[in-house]
């Protein structure tokens, strides 16, 4: 092709960023235009100069990874002949049909009365009713009846004690006839103390029953772990060394959305290498399913995927896909995977963005599934590790020390009708596709639409279809990370709170197993207990005010002979308070006793683990009222329809600034101070009972800030406080994750979108991975031209994120933008690109040197 335009002055700069030899660079430096340069690189004639950059994508891409891309047959062409990178396997669609929810029992009853039938369910090859009846189901039912008796019996006794503690004992003497003859004010003053006491007693019963459930769960978990005699544990179903059948293919899927890219792909690489070390890598494929809508992060993900595939030789085993339409959030992401590739796999392991799993753990999960044909989901108990802030280290210590008791206890009571936590679990693909697709909740408002907390619902649907849901609580090799500070944890809790409240709409859905109805209830109580506790404290304060400010009514009947005196039984109050403290803190003591018995070396020794437990208990006492108020706010926000978003500034060291702590905790501090002054004015002696609450609220700002500091967490680890075995003797997977995270951060891609537009190599990768591959059509061409013109007109600083996403998804528009930025010399884009390189202290030296086949001569 011919062109009389002068030689661009930036041609040499462009060539310097392509990895090739000096001879190749000198040969291409003679090109008159960028269109000619791209034509030479592509080794084929280009009729339209605007498409020249698109034509050279393949050559620019293979300059760095030619051998591996060709060996894995990763390069292909789309329907229009444009080069694309096969980042996903060929699509083989499977039907995924969610069943509509019928949450209104009145509507269901009316349909039954009127003879209307529901649409027939889809027919499947293997119906769940054909699964054999297992003995564990009968055993589980008996155990849960025992748990119910223990909880209710304990609550009734405690409620009886609580009733005796309250001062006003005369409900039976309140005469309804007398009330009708009094004024409203007289009636209110007479009835108010008893109404307050009744409300307090009701709330106390609910809260005590909730505490009792946790106590009995932890106690049975302690006995299970201490004796080691659990013939129903799922991990005993396999010997652990059976060869995995060739057809038992497993997909490891990692849904991500705007995550920390270096950490995500470090954990993925560590998991991949651990699976490879088992010799069973051919049974596994890895999928990164991205819902990222921040273009800089999306480009960084693409580069990180290419890097991890190149470094592990994982092309054809590690796949990457970014959705353009983010439907139904995480559950929709998994639905899309099941619809496109789910039929190719027998099992699926779901990973979180911070998950790491060992190869031994993953192969054991597959063997357990093979050995347990009626198991639909097997959930591991992830161990928290890898954090440095004081807050996170205390939390991961708590989950590592106390968590095993509760997970073992859950397994004891639930057996194969247990929890699924949404990650670090293996799922039988066929029943999951057939029965666990989630339809939106009907109606309008905050509790309608796409289900947020999908995991509990999927477990309930799996059990409804007749498949078991198990917790492999004793299976090692499963890891996760915790939020680094209190405010980040609360952001997560707000989403979980809304999701659990939504799930409760499914409590009465037809066919749900009673255990999973209870799971929905416990999910709600995890957050609803906070406002109940808050209202309990408020009503107690109101009762104190009534008792202090109002003259007691001693005679409730017209001809009552003896006065009714308010009663005080401090000995009963102390006994009940002591019992509650035992229920709350005995599980923690039992956890440490278990560690003493099993070996405390990995926790820093008996003395250090005991001191750490005491410090963690003090810290949990300080944080409990803070969480109570936040969770109360979250519950109210969900019912009032407030948006569940909380934008918090990014912090490299994960610490909480003082200004943010004041903003978030200031109202709590003020409430605590006012509450303390009110109680002191009413009755100073009562302040001792309320001191743990109000003092914690007044200290919330410094506690939140100080606990978020990394230096304090590292110092505590150096002194062997809050130490966990994964730090004392870290497994190879966690060592590799830390190493790869450090390496990834060293050369992490910054200003990704600008790089994808301007940089020769990044543009080639972005064009090859772009998924919006439309055929030639005039309306599409007009839109493309408008997008490119707009990007050049406003520059990178003013281009909106939505416009960036559209360009990043369209290989043609992105290629044209790249070509015009260089050929027309758009300095605003070029300067931003140069600045991003100069700001990177780890940028490679220029000109880039050739890699592999990049040293071959450039076709003329």
Curated annotation (Swiss-Prot):
Pathway this chain belongs to: Glycan metabolism; osmoregulated periplasmic glucan (OPG) biosynthesis
InterPro entries linked: Glucans_biosynth_gluTrFase_H, Glyco_trans_2-like, Glycosyltr_2/OpgH_subfam, Nucleotide-diphossugar_trans
Residue spans crossing the bilayer: 146-166, 200-220, 519-539, 576-596, 610-630, 686-706
A UniProt-annotated Pfam family: Glycos_transf_2
Subcellular localization, as worded in the UniProt entry: Cell inner membrane
Transmembrane listed as a keyword: yes
Molecular function per GO: hexosyltransferase activity
Membrane-topology annotation of the record: Multi-pass membrane protein
Superkingdom of the organism of origin: Bacteria
EC number(s) on file: 2.4.1.-
Its job: Involved in the biosynthesis of osmoregulated periplasmic glucans (OPGs).
NCBIfam families from the UniProt entry: PRK05454.1-1, PRK05454.2-1, PRK05454.2-5
Protein name stated in the entry: Glucans biosynthesis glucosyltransferase H
Source organism per UniProt: Pseudomonas savastanoi pv. phaseolicola (strain 1448A / Race 6)
Gene name in the database record: opgH
């Amino acid at each position: 092709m011919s062109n009389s335009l002068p030689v661009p002055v930036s041609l040499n700069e462009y060539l310097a960023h392509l990895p090739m030899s000096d001879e190749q660079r000198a040969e291409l430096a003679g090109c008159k235009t960028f269109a000619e340069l791209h034509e030479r690189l592509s080794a084929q004639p280009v009729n339209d100069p605007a498409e020249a950059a698109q034509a050279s994508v393949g050559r620019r891409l293979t300059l760095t990874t030619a051998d591996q891309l060709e060996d894995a047959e990763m390069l292909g062409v789309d329907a229009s002949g444009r080069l694309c990178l096969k980042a996903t396997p060929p699509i083989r669609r499977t039907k995924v049909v969610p069943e509509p929810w019928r949450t209104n029992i009145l509507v269901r009853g009316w349909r039954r009365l009127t003879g209307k039938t529901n649409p027939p369910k889809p027919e499947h090859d293997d119906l769940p009713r054909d699964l054999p009846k297992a003995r564990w189901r009968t055993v589980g039912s008996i155990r849960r009846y025992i748990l119910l008796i223990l909880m209710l019996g304990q609550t009734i006794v405690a409620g009886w004690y609580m009733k005796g503690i309250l001062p006003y004992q005369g409900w039976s003497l309140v005469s309804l006839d007398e009330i009708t003859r009094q004024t409203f004010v007289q009636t209110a003053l007479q009835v108010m103390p008893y109404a307050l006491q009744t409300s307090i007693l009701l709330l106390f019963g609910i809260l005590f029953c909730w505490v009792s459930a946790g106590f009995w769960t932890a106690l049975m978990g302690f006995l299970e772990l201490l004796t080691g005699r659990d013939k129903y544990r799922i991990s005993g179903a396999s010997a652990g060394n059976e060869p995995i059948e060739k057809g038992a293919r497993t997909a490891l899927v990692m849904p991500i959305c705007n995550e920390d890219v270096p950490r995500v792909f470090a954990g993925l690489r560590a998991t991949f290498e651990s699976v490879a070390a088992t010799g069973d890598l051919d049974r596994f494929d890895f999928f990164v399913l991205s819902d990222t809508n921040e273009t800089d992060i999306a480009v960084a993900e693409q580069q990180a995927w290419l890097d991890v595939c190149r470094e592990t030789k994982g092309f054809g085993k590690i796949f990457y896909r970014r959705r353009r339409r983010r439907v139904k959030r995480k559950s929709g992401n998994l639905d899309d995977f099941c619809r496109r590739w789910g039929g190719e796999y027998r099992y699926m392991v779901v990973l979180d963005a911070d998950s790491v799993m060992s190869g031994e753990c993953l192969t054991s999960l597959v063997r357990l599934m093979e050995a347990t044909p009626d198991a639909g989901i097997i959930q591991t108990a992830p161990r928290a590790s890898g954090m440095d802030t004081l807050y996170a280290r205390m939390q991961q210590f708590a989950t590592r020390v106390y968590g095993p008791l509760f997970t073992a206890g859950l397994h004891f009571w639930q057996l194969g009708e247990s929890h699924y936590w949404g990650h670090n679990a293996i799922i039988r693909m066929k029943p999951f596709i057939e029965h666990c697709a989630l339809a939106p909740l009907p109606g309008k408002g905050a509790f309608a639409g796409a289900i947020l907390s999908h995991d509990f619902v999927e477990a309930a649907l799996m059990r409804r279809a007749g498949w078991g849901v198990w917790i492999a609580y004793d299976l090692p090799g499963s890891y996760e990370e915790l939020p680094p500070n209190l405010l980040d944890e609360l952001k997560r809790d707000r989403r979980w709170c809304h999701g659990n409240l939504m799930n409760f709409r499914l409590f009465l859905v037809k066919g749900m197993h009673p255990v999973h109805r209870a799971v929905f209830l416990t999910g709600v109580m995890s957050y609803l207990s906070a406002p109940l506790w808050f209202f309990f404290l408020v009503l107690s304060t109101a009762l104190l005010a009534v008792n202090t400010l109002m003259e007691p009514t001693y005679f409730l009947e017209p001809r009552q002979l003896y006065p009714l005196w308010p009663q005080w039984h401090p000995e009963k109050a102390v006994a009940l308070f002591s019992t509650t403290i035992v229920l709350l803190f005995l599980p923690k003591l039992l956890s440490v006793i278990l560690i003493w018995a099993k070996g405390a070396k990995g926790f820093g020794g008996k003395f250090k683990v005991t001191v750490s437990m005491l410090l963690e208990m003090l810290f949990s006492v300080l944080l409990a009222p803070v969480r109570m108020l936040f969770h109360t706010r979250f519950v109210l926000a969900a019912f009032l329809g407030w948006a569940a978003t909380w934008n918090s500034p990014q912090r490299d060291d994960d610490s909480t600034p003082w200004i943010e702590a004041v903003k978030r905790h200031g109202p709590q501090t003020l409430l605590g101070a006012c509450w303390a002054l009110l109680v002191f004015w009413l009755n100073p002696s009562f302040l001792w009972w309320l001191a743990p609450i109000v003092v914690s609220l007044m200290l919330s700002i410094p506690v939140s800030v100080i606990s978020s500091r990394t230096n304090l967490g590292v110092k505590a680890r150096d002194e062997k406080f809050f130490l966990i075995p994964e730090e004392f003797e870290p497994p190879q997977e966690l060592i590799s994750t830390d190493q790869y995270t450090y390496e990834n951060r060293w050369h992490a891609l910054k200003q990704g979108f600008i790089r994808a537009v301007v940089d020769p190599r990044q543009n080639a990768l972005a064009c090859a991975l772009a998924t919006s591959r439309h055929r030639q059509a005039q309306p599409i061409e007009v839109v493309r031209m408008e997008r490119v013109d707009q990007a050049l007109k406003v520059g990178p600083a003013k281009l909106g994120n939505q416009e960036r996403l559209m360009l990043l998804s369209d290989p043609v528009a992105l290629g044209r933008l790249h070509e015009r930025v260089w050929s027309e010399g758009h300095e605003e884009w070029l300067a931003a690109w140069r600045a991003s390189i100069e700001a990177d202290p780890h940028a490679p030296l220029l000109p880039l040197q050739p890699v592999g086949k990049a040293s071959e001569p450039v076709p003329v």
